[in-house]
């Protein structure tokens, strides 16, 4: 499983406990739930190791300030980061529209910074100094997605929030921790004031990290296969009770997405009214 609970509720602590207790002996999924000891978690960044892009393809003084690659999603969860993404977009659109671009699905065209889909995410990213990389959710241990790594491989410096224990995976000197800012405006000012020398130091740190043998081993497909082989056990045979529990979880997942769709309509209407 590679999605957090805000996308697939079955991956929540509640869902994991039911799966571990009633459906499987051991499941290789995506989290570190202490209360569900039969659950093992591993999310490798997609496509790792990817070839490092030419980090000097676009000179510093020709790069725009920042970009974001994200879909316009909504979720009914106190840990979701979709709302914070929209706050950042609004802030950057208001204060530096000429230096920020947004790419992704389902954004309203009334946003002046919206550029639609990027044909090549990595080549597009090279045109920017920073990439805003907020995950779908926070406070879900081990839920490390591809956004942070995509930015680093493209040669940009990521502004990241997601996994609370991120420095267990990636050194602090390789990214800008969005949690240090009290508001999107404070983050914007920090990025605008960074010197070329400071920026290049981040990029040197990134190259050193992603080029290391330890990183390649930990986040490669081979590394994932090894983790699965070490953790996985044979599943129990299905019984009628287990099938009923699984169907209940699938129904829970379906109802959650209907609620999210309703929330999306309400929030989109609010966005349109504000811009009007």
Predicted regions and their residues:
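Active-site proximal beta-strand in glycosyltransferases
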Residues: 1-5
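Pol beta-like nucleotidyltransferase catalytic core
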Residues: 10-102, 106, 110-276
């Amino acid at each position: 499983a590679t999605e957090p609970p805000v996308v697939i509720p079955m991956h929540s602590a509640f869902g994991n406990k039911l799966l571990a207790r009633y459906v499987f002996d051991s499941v290789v999924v995506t989290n570190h739930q202490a209360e569900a000891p039969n659950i093992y978690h591993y999310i490798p960044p997609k496509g790792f190791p990817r070839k490092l892009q030419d980090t000097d393809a676009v000179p510093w003084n020709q790069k725009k300030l920042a970009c974001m690659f994200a879909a316009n999603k909504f979720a009914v969860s106190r840990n979701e980061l979709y709302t914070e993404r929209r706050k950042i977009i609004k802030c950057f659109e208001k204060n530096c529209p000429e230096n920020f671009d947004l790419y992704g699905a389902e954004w309203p065209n009334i946003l002046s910074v919206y550029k639609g889909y990027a044909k090549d995410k990595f080549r597009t990213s090279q045109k920017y100094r920073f990439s805003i990389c907020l995950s779908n959710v926070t406070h879900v241990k081990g839920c490390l997605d591809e956004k942070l790594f995509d930015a680093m491989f493209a040669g940009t410096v990521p502004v990241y929030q997601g996994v609370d224990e991120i420095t267990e995976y990636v050194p602090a000197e390789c990214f800008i921790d969005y949690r240090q800012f009290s508001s999107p405006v404070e983050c914007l000012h920090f990025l605008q004031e960074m010197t070329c020398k400071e920026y290049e130091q981040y990029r040197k740190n990134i190259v050193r990290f992603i080029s290391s043998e330890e990183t390649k081993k930990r986040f490669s497909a081979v590394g994932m296969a090894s983790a699965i082989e070490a953790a996985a056990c044979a599943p129990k045979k299905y019984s009628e009770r287990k099938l009923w529990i699984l169907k209940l979880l699938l129904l829970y997942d379906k109802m959650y997405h209907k609620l999210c769709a309703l929330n999306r309509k309400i929030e989109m209407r609010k966005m349109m009214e504000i811009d009007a």
